[in-house]
């Protein structure tokens, strides 16, 4: 009975998409779903509206209210335009940057968004082709814009696309603007969307921004001399068909590296990602072609960026000469260890310097920071929180690096999102520094463990798609809260941190408050054998 009622509701909702307000292609797709005896696709496409969350939109592409298409993207852009015109009502020239990655329909969604912004009187700096997410963040700051968007679904499967919204500092939107934008987006109907653009307000940008951005990225090199000595470092790089192909090889060359070997089949822009199961640089499968090339040429390092070039995965040879993946925690550890140790060694460290990591990233980073007397801050998962720490400290302290276990790293403050362009360049410098001492990156990692303590981290992703999946994940989180484990892996739980209630509970049941800027659906269990288990609900865009 419940299912019949749901089918009735989604059918009524879908039939509204058969009106002239929607194009013929969309109407044909909706009609096909309505006529299909199996209503699974119809239900999942229309059972809810694709939520414009604090990070923007993300969803499967197709017709429907719960899909990424020109109407859901259009509503998001119209809502953001409305908010910008309210928020900056006294400003003469409101402007935004619009970028996109390699995904199917990304360029189409970007152009439609540019038209809508311009139709609302907002000047648009539109990238001429795909660009890395961090360059979009940089361009917002470079042009002094009030906002910006990037059409991307990061490393999600090929069926997905997304819409990331940024504020005037180049960071993803935070409170109070995030919820205010959501309110505006939720008010928009298809009739409200201004699709007819004003070409006089759209400025195409490209190589001139690339040059300024790459010059700034080059400025963060800590030890150019070691690169000069190791300029022939053998690097294998793959963009996994994405936006990294545009700038990462150029950045490596600008830093002075001369032996850059790109995986040719994966240098081709392709939103279907034909050479990988999923374009996620965390996965061994995604790096298999790069590692095969590395074995063939006896390379020193393998790096892969995801489709929008904000995350980077890395592999190197272990002590037996076998190629191994370096996970996000290990990469972040090496990244920040090098920044701290070598800034100190070269006399570049200042008393007000600080680093940032997320609460789910390895605690060994804190050990490195503490021993070297550098301030380290913990923040929520997501680079917008790292960007928040940078913004709060502007003019008072200097951010020198940060990262998260999900393969996102940032060594500069002129970008306010994770940056695979600068990260690949700096990781190559770290590899050159190691080789200059007769070591590998693996040797460096082992030395860090010996000095600061051994640690092993594992990430388990549980994927539950669709409406039923969202309900199942919610039930799992509710159960953990209602029935917290007394022991994990044979070790008693000594402390629980609940970031949804902002409560810390010790083994005796004493409760105290956690000092965080807002709540987040994250649970942490600390055990007596010093294990730490994080459980979190994924952010839904």
Cite the ranges covered by each PLM segment:
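An N-terminal, well-structured beta->alpha segment
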Residues: 7, 14-113, 203-232, 243, ...
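Gly/Ser/Thr-enriched, mixed-charge loops and adjacent short helices
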Residues: 17, 21, 25, 41-45, ...
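Conserved phosphate/anionic-ligand binding catalytic regions in large, soluble enzymes, centered on
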Residues: 48-66, 153-156, 239-247, 307, ...
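N-terminal small/polar loop signature for handling phosphorylated ligands or for N-terminal nucleophile
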Residues: 97-160, 258-313
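Glycine-rich phosphate-binding loop plus the immediately following alpha-helix
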Residues: 166-194, 329-352, 357-367, 420
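Phosphate-binding and adjacent anionic-ligand microenvironments
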Residues: 295, 299-301, 322-324, 342-532, ...
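Short "domain-exit" segments at the C-terminal end of structured domains
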Residues: 537-541
């Amino acid at each position: 009975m419940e299912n019949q009622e749901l089918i009735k509701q989604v059918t009524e909702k879908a039939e509204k998409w058969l009106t002239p307000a929607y194009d013929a292609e969309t109407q044909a797709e909706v009609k096909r779903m309505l006529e299909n005896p199996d209503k699974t696709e119809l239900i999942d496409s229309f059972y809810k509206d694709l939520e414009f969350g604090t990070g923007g939109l993300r969803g499967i592409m197709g017709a429907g209210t719960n899909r990424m298409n020109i109407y859901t993207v259009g509503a998001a852009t119209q809502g953001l335009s409305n908010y910008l015109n309210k928020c900056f009502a006294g400003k003469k020239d409101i402007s935004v940057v619009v970028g996109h990655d390699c995904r199917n329909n990304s360029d189409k969604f970007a152009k439609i968004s540019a038209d809508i912004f311009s139709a609302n009187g907002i000047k648009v700096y539109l990238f001429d082709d795909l660009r890395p997410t961090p360059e979009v963040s940089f361009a917002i700051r470079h042009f002094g814009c009030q906002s910006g968007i990037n059409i991307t679904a990061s490393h999600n499967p090929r069926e997905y696309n997304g819409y990331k919204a940024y504020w005037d500092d180049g960071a993803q939107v935070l409170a109070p603007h995030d919820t205010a934008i959501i309110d505006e987006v939720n008010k928009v109907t298809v009739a409200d969307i201004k699709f007819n653009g004003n070409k006089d307000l759209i400025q195409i940008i490209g190589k001139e921004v690339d040059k300024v951005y790459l010059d700034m990225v080059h400025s963060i090199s800590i030890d150019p001399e070691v690169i000069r000595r190791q300029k022939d470092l053998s690097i294998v790089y793959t963009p996994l068909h994405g936006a990294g192909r545009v700038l990462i090889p150029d950045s490596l060359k600008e830093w002075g590296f001369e032996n850059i070997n790109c995986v040719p089949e994966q240098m081709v822009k392709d939103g279907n990602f034909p050479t990988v199961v999923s374009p996620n640089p965390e996965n061994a499968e995604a790096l298999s072609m790069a590692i095969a090339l590395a074995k063939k040429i006896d390379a020193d390092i393998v790096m892969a960026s995801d489709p929008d070039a904000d995350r980077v995965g890395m592999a190197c040879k272990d002590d037996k000469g076998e190629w191994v993946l370096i996970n996000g925690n290990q990469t972040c550890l090496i990244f920040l260890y090098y920044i701290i140790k070598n800034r100190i060694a070269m006399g570049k460290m200042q008393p007000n310097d600080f680093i940032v990591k997320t609460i789910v990233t390895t605690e060994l980073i804190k050990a490195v920071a503490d021993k070297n007397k550098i301030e380290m801050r913990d923040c929520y998962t997501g680079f917008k929180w790292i960007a928040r720490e940078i913004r709060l400290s502007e003019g008072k302290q200097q951010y020198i690096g940060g990262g998260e276990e999900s393969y996102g790293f940032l060594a500069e403050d002129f970008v306010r999102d994770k940056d695979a362009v600068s990260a690949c360049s700096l990781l190559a410098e770290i590899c050159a520094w190691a080789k200059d001492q007769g070591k590998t990156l693996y040797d460096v990692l082992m030395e860090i463990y010996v000095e600061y303590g051994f640690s092993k981290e594992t990430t388990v992703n549980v994927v539950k798609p669709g409406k039923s999946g969202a309900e199942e994940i919610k039930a799992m989180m509710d159960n953990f809260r209602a029935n917290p484990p007394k022991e994990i892996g044979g070790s008693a739980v000594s402390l629980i941190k609940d970031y949804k209630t902002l409560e810390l509970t010790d083994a005796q049941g004493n409760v105290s408050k956690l000092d965080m800027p807002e709540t987040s659906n994250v649970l942490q269990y600390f055990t007596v054998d010093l294990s730490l288990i994080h459980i979190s609900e994924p952010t839904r865009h």
